[in-house]
């Protein structure tokens, strides 16, 4: 399991970044508020990671957070029946707007 990734942002999309760690680019889904703060940084960034293998869709998704507490909240939310990773990410975004 991947706990965190540290590297340089090579590309940022609407809701994700591609993080270059040692020559390998990882696509990491993040909340837009974090995207805005990370896109201004040229230095290395560290993202705490939740990884998810979706067998039905055949995808491997990663969700990144700048704080361990946000990742813990994400894990708590996804443990609730009916809340998937995408909805949990939206709820974490709402929580971060109070920071």
What does each model-found stretch correspond to?
Residues 1-5:
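Short coil-to-beta-strand transition motifs
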Residues 11-98:
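Long, highly charged, low-complexity intrinsically disordered interaction regions
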Residues 7-9:
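Conserved hydrophobic positions within beta-strands
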